[in-house]
């Protein structure tokens, strides 16, 4: 006879018994489909000789005895596998294997291999012997359903199959029983296995007397741990834990620290815990929950410093500049001091914890009325939620640490980069295995107070997926109107975050969602100028480098000129991280020289020494093109890494289709900007005396560094100038840069990031920058050293740029690298309000 077959690993099914098998191998799935469609759900199971082997070569890898089964049910799993339940029908012997119509080796040629029954009653004799001497062993090693079936067995054959099927034993042993020819031989093997099992259990009972010395280290450790549990229970350690919690709740400060609702929840949970088995998973979950509730600080806060002079000194000791953010923190401190003066009654609600810098603030977790469901707060308790936005290396994280030290508060950092799951913020519900509170509650527990400074690092790097949107969860955290009633899914009680000072950091505020951006106070940390970097290196970085490398000041003498050389030729960044790395590398080289006795007592680091120690110069003053070309113009860009220059190139060539071609990974807005620029030039070709056949030639616009995606409308005037330069065949000086959005009517619209863009122009050596007239007010933000080296020309219409660069065609006036650009007096331009 022929039936589809499936190789099994570690599964033996006896006649009349059912087995559940998860199937995933392609041939096995094909055999199931064939059995279902053509063989009335009949499927042969043949055990593999090696259960660890995944791929088999059939006859040589299979046992020659198997069982014909009937498939009772099939369930498709989420991973594509199937779970089948089969019932044993007949024992068979495998003769050969052949292919099905799909060329799969899944058809087995079989012959029946029935179990021989002894007629002399030997089977019944063995069964009676088992029931007399081994009944306790049988009952304790079989599930309830198997014991029930044994009690009502109809034949010795059925009794044998039930025992063999349900007893837990090694696969090899079970197959040995399965393959025996006669029922008596099967029973003899089962009997010997049960006797062996009985002896093992007897050894366990007499463990301390007989084989304690022979226990291996793992068994001994397990035994000791089990005994320790019993000893702890006898000594009442669990009761001690309960007493500790009770003492904490009922102490003088505990009653004030924990809100009534929290105490009530803890007591209810303790009552539930008493009714649970101590070893049950629910009990462990309950104990962990009680620990979290008792270990959270609730009304416990640290005492804020209120000395404005000392606070200013601390902020200045950490960072150079950053006037705006320092002023904001001083304002917050001033308001807090003023509130304490105006509302002295608030001090009565604070209880100082003896011999500590902490106090209990009874204003926290307070309801206006007993009937209220949520907590209330006073407006004077509002704490600013700051977002420090700036390029990498500009001191955002270290500034947050300085703020924490200024306020004398605990500082906790939460990294949000790559967070995709809402539960990371709000926590998991306690029904999940291994559930924990979210990052906010974990940070507060770690701080041990309810008013820490929490740094939400890289808030612009959060993203969402099918698990939820963590950005939306952050809305509740960062909204002063809502965070007084923040609810974590694990804690399930409202937690007042109104005293927490949240400081978020981001590289690019455009990457922060609009609702989240609306809830924070943006403070921009812009790129540093060369002079600022020199000052930072002199006042902060060099001291740190000398300390880390154990060098004396005399061994690391470096002038401002050498620092400027190092900054310009070995770093190209908005912040100072690479500058610190370069200084650190110099220090390490000097340490090596010192240990090799190749260093003079006083070592002066000149520009020549920098090249000797750090190697070839990485960046030069003319690393961009330093000559004028037709159709090439310098644009200015603002990215999350600071300002940068953007060279735009235009060329033309004959093409009957005409039109425009754009390359350089330009995104949608920038593509539209280029198309608007071309449309403006075409519509004003006569006005600008452009003699060009647009229908017979194609215009190709390219922005170099094609691997980097680019977007934004601020390159509009640059596109326009590059197109006119290419069409009129008049070059534009490489010392000229520009930024501004252009309209179809030629109006120049304002742009963002002027400070960053002007710094990029300054680094490149650009001497003239055209900016939109409405950006005049932003010039006050530009560093003086930049304004001294760059002439800013404000324009409201493109005609003004054209007249400056190309002049009137009649006198062929144009700007070259050797000619002076006419200045416009912008010194009197006042910022608009």
Swiss-Prot record:
NCBIfam families from the UniProt entry: lon
One record GO biological process: cellular response to heat
Location of the Lon proteolytic domain: 627-808
Native source organism of the sequence: Mycoplasma mobile (strain ATCC 43663 / 163K / NCTC 11711) (Mesomycoplasma mobile)
CDD domains documented for this protein: RecA-like_Lon
Main localization of the protein described in the UniProt heading: cytoplasm
Domain Lon N-terminal: 3-198
InterPro entries: AAA+_ATPase, ATPase_AAA_core, Lon_bac, Lon_bac/euk-typ, Lon_lid, Lon_proteolytic, Lon_Prtase, Lon_prtase_N
Protein family (similarity comment): Belongs to the peptidase S16 family.
GO cellular component: cytoplasm
Molecular function, one GO term: ATP binding
Gene name for this UniProt entry: lon
Induction conditions: By heat shock.
Identification of the protein by name: Lon protease
UniProt keyword annotation of tRNA processing present: no
Reactions the enzyme catalyzes: Hydrolysis of proteins in presence of ATP
